[in-house]
Design a protein with these regions (language model features):
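The serine-hydrolase catalytic nucleophile loop
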Residues: 105-116, 131, 273
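Alpha/beta-hydrolase-fold serine-hydrolase catalytic core, especially in secreted/extracellular enzymes
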Residues: 288, 297-301, 305-422, 428-518
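Short beta-strand element of the alpha/beta-hydrolase
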Residues: 92-102
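Alpha/beta-hydrolase active-site loop
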Residues: 140-161
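Primarily recognizes the serine-hydrolase "nucleophile elbow" in alpha/beta-hydrolase
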Residues: 156-216
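N-terminal cap/lid segment of alpha/beta-hydrolase-fold proteins
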Residues: 39-92
Length: 518
């Protein structure tokens, strides 16, 4: 009967703890999630050719290219290097294009060389400046200040010999499109804006979509996939990262000049359809329908040979030709209804997931709170271990002396506490290792093996074992058949409390990471 009673107490404790953890997981989940994208575009032709009804444009390779390195002075007296590439035999004046870096590039000598040279050979003067890196870090970026810095380069380009200042525009990639959108909002005299692989939406929202898409592609467990809203909704101010909430959309309402949007259909990090629709909708609302959209079967950088962004990959063969034809056609004065090629064309895109409309937080409001929760469990267990060692030393000293007061744990409880602490700590370490492996696989777009998928199920089962062991430990303490106390001595009570609290804190951390979602 006593064994049955103890088994019932253990079962009841297990159910209660499990229900509490499931409710905790529900409370940690925000009121949004990343949904599949369904509002797909249909391109009318696979050809990406750009042509104006006003007449032919200067083709690539027409002019020899002259390259010159210059210095540009930014705010605060900071000097950066820049490279001007221009058609050396151009008569009169012509259009020009300023290049704006995306994330991950900085030196003018290391980026845009093939693009800028090709444009110059088609009669378009180009300027590629260095990115100012003394105010640009992984954790802090001021896009307004960066736009002002690029404005200095724009002024220099407008005053360059052989450049028509009324025909100077921007070419921006990825993160750089946020900067270019600030510039076009503030300076309506910018002649054109080319947006290649633009995130369009604030970084936090775009990254939620991108991270989910990467995890979907590699076959990540549902539990890992569904933790994205919990992470992306957090206050990240502990690290800085204020630029994650850069309000990008209002600037798109000021795109009054001709716009060209380019996406690679193999790029799962960008909203290749949703973002394009957003830009077109906003420009149409202000009366600007001169928006050309092209899709290429390429990666994020419009380069071929790999789905990932890698150094040395070749540009898509038609890409530079289309850019040059479009810029020269815009310089000729081509209006929205004067293009002889479709406004939307290229490879058929298929965006996997939708950028969420908002990114509210759940029960864990900030990165600080999450790190506190995750650190508290191991710290409490470490203190419990220290308490146990001190208790053992104290018992040994009493045994050698004349103090024969008894203290300690009941039979079997010591083993349970050791098992509980070791399993909790081991599970935490295993989960972190698993998450790190999944992230590494996702960044490389390497599909998870069946063994890796099975490991998640194993972690889930071990978490249930941890809950059962916790319930069994509570039974050993509070439901004894012999009526004797399970713990004697303040030090041992402290060790017990620290072990239980540490295990519960780790269990809460595991629940945050959706370990019970198979």
């Amino acid at each position: 009967m006593q064994k049955l009673k103890r088994a019932g107490f253990t079962a009841a404790s297990f159910v209660v703890i499990l229900l509490v953890m499931l409710l905790l997981g529900q409370a940690m989940t925000p009121d949004w999630r990343v949904e599949p994208y369904r509002d797909h575009l249909r391109v009318s032709t696979r050809s990406t050719t750009v042509a104006s009804s006003l007449g032919p444009t200067t083709p690539e390779g027409t002019h020899p290219v002259k390259e010159q390195k210059i210095s540009i002075t930014l705010a605060g007296g900071v000097h950066i290097q820049a490279i001007v590439r221009e058609p050396s035999d151009l008569k009169g004046t012509g259009p020009a294009c300023l290049f704006i870096h995306g994330a991950g590039t900085g030196k003018s000598s290391e980026v845009f060389g093939d693009l800028a040279s090709a444009m110059a050979s088609a009669g378009i003067t180009t300027l590629v400046p260095d990115k100012r890196l003394d105010t640009y870090t992984t954790l802090h970026r001021d896009y307004q200040a960066m736009a002002a810095d690029y404005g200095r380069s724009l002024d220099r380009l407008r005053s360059w010999p052989g450049v028509d200042p009324t025909k100077v525009g921007l070419y921006a990639e990825s993160e750089g499109t946020w900067i270019s959108s600030i510039m076009t909002a503030k300076d309506t005299s910018i002649a054109f804006s080319i947006l290649t692989s633009p995130p369009v939406y604030p970084g936090r929202r775009q990254m939620a979509m991108a991270a989910t898409s990467y995890l979907d592609l590699i076959g990540a467990p549902k539990g890992i996939r569904n933790v994205i809203p919990r992470l992306m909704g957090m206050d990240l101010s502990l690290l800085g990262l204020e630029y994650a909430d850069f309000p990008s959309l209002p600037y798109l309402d000021q795109l009054r000049m001709p716009v060209m949007i380019n996406f690679g259909t193999m790029d799962v990090s960008m909203p290749v359809e949703q973002g394009a629709r957003e830009i077109i909708r906003r420009t149409h609302a202000i009366g600007n329908d001169n928006v050309t959209l092209r899709y290429y079967p390429t990666n994020h950088q419009i380069r071929t040979g790999s789905r990932l962004a890698k150094a040395g990959l070749p540009l898509e063969p038609r890409y530079t030709h289309n850019l040059e034809d479009w810029i020269n056609a815009v310089a000729m004065g081509t209006k929205a209804d004067q293009w002889s090629t479709p406004m939307i064309a290229g490879s058929q895109p298929h965006q996997l997931n939708q950028v969420p409309r908002h990114t509210n937080t759940g029960l864990i409001p900030s990165l600080t709170a999450l790190l506190t929760l995750m650190a508290s469990g191991p710290i409490l267990l470490a203190v419990a271990l220290l308490s146990a060692l001190i208790g053992a030393l104290s018992s040994h000293l009493r045994a050698r002396g004349k103090d024969h007061r008894q203290s300690g744990f009941s039979k079997g409880l010591t083993g349970r506490l050791w098992s509980l602490g070791l399993l909790a700590a081991g599970l935490m370490a295993a989960l972190l290792a698993y998450a790190f492996t999944v992230v590494r696989q996702a960044l490389g777009l390497m599909h998870l093996s069946s063994m890796m998928a099975s490991c998640w199920s194993l972690l889930s089962v071990l978490c249930l074992v941890l809950i059962l062991l916790l319930a069994s430990t509570l039974t050993s303490v509070f439901s004894r058949s012999d009526g004797k106390p399970a713990v004697v001595g303040a030090g041992h009570w402290l060790t017990l409390a620290l072990t239980l609290l540490g295990s519960l804190a780790i269990l809460g951390s595991l629940i945050f990471w959706n370990i019970l979602v198979f």
